[in-house]
Design a protein with these regions (language model features):
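Short acidic, glycine/proline-enriched helix-loop-strand junctions
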Residues: 205-212, 255-259
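Short, basic/aromatic-enriched C-terminal tail that caps enzymatic domains
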Residues: 244-258
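Short secondary-structure boundary segments
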Residues: 190, 218, 240
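Acidic/glycine-rich phosphate/pyrophosphate-binding loops and surrounding catalytic core
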Residues: 1-181, 185, 197-202, 213-215, ...
Length: 259
């Protein structure tokens, strides 16, 4: 109603706070599919500062305004994920630990690819992109099958040799059972730092620590991540990277009416 049909404008997407930018590649594809010229002023995975232009747009004013919110939502969410991931990754590195920081499958419906790509751009590990990327034996599988040992046995018999097997455990005894059964990765789910130490120590005493990767997950955040990294686990997976993300503050501003 307000904007004449053939008005053309130049606009810019501007960062309102510092962070790691993600979603530029997807934004360009979206804009170009709508006939809007898009010029990236920063690459995915790079840091931006407050007030910096990250993307320039040129084209039909109605189209740009119609896609504005979708565009900002996508880049803001992905950049927020990348920024938080990078902050945690760098915190662990700065403390001298080599623990991998990974996300989980607790992503927004329909946005798993974008969420996980943002984690990767922030320096984190994507864990599984799809259910069939790896065999993850969880508590409900064990409840149905009867035991971790039997679940691992079935997985090893039926799966390709190329598939790693991870077992989610809820006690030190289950961790030992899973490792002895031949699981490649042991996930200590909702363990306290004290319980993680006990599990790692027990695996060492049994002579099987070097045969498995140890992942911890559940109730871990930016504040307590170093408590877990200091124990010597291999992977820390955090649901907060994607399910509780704070979007990076961005805005779209029309800079010039060209026609």
């Amino acid at each position: 109603i307000l904007i004449p049909e053939n008005v053309k404008v130049k606009a810019e997407i501007i960062a309102k706070e510092p962070g790691i930018i993600a979603g530029i590649e997807e934004a360009k594809i979206l804009l170009e599919s709508l006939g809007i010229k898009a010029e990236a002023k920063i690459k995915d995975g790079q840091k931006t500062s407050c007030g910096k232009t990250i993307l320039k747009l040129e084209g039909n004013a109605r189209t740009i305004l119609a896609v504005e919110r979708t565009l900002l939502n996508l880049i803001s969410r992905m950049s927020g994920i990348a920024t938080q991931t990078n902050r945690i990754v760098e915190k662990v590195k700065a403390a001298g630990y080599r623990t991998k920081i990974a996300c989980t499958r607790k992503t927004a419906p329909g946005l798993e690819y974008f969420d996980k790509k943002a984690v990767w751009l922030g320096g984190g590990d994507t864990h599984r992109l799809h259910l069939d990327d790896m065999i993850l034996i969880k508590d409900n599988h064990i409840a149905i099958i009867g035991s971790i040992k039997e679940a691992v046995k079935i997985a090893k018999e039926k799966a390709s040799f190329s598939k790693k097997i991870e077992a989610e455990v809820s006690s030190v005894d289950e961790a030992i059972e899973a490792a002895r059964a031949g699981a490649d990765i042991i996930m200590l789910d909702n363990f306290s730092p004290k319980q993680v130490r006990e599990a790692v120590k027990k695996l060492e005493e049994e002579g099987i620590r070097d045969k498995v990767l140890v992942e911890v997950s559940g109730r871990i955040n930016e504040e307590n991540v170093l408590e877990f990294a200091s124990i010597g686990v291999d992977i820390i997976s955090l649901g907060i990277l994607t399910h509780s993300v704070k979007a990076l503050d961005l805005s779209l501003e029309v800079k010039q009416v060209t026609a």
